Design a protein with these regions (language model features):
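N-terminal leader/targeting and accessory segments in enzymes
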Residues: 1-98, 102
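Walker A (P-loop) phosphate-binding motif
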Residues: 100-110
């Protein structure tokens, strides 16, 4: 497992539970022991986290079900209609920026 994935696995649960952009977590999901964070549903593997980003040309929320079928451990979305089995945040783009900053800071402290 690459070092950045190991760091994400070690610190994700603490990060998400204190994240200011968090709206809701499905209590049934296990926030530990995943492979990686993935934004491309075509590349999802079993036990990955799918981050449903939306842009000008696509809406990642349209691919939540596909990512589940491919075996994602859970997903992160800003669409309240997809909360079962996932994490609801204010903005998935801001979440991606914030988790990246968090991991950079954790890496500096090591």
């Amino acid at each position: 497992m690459p070092e950045e994935n190991r760091l994400l696995n070690l610190h994700f649960e603490n990060f998400i539970k204190s994240y200011s952009g968090l709206l809701k977590i499905d209590s049934r999901i296990d926030l530990t022991h995943f492979n990686t964070l993935c934004t491309d549903s075509r590349k999802i593997n079993k036990n990955d986290i799918f981050l449903a980003l939306s842009g000008e040309n696509f809406d990642g929320n349209e691919f939540v079900n596909e990512s589940i079928e491919k075996g994602c451990k859970f997903f992160i979305t800003e669409n309240p209609s997809h909360i079962n089995g996932g994490i609801l945040v204010k903005s998935t783009l801001e979440f991606l920026e914030d988790i990246a900053k968090f991991l950079i800071n954790v890496n500096r402290d090591i």
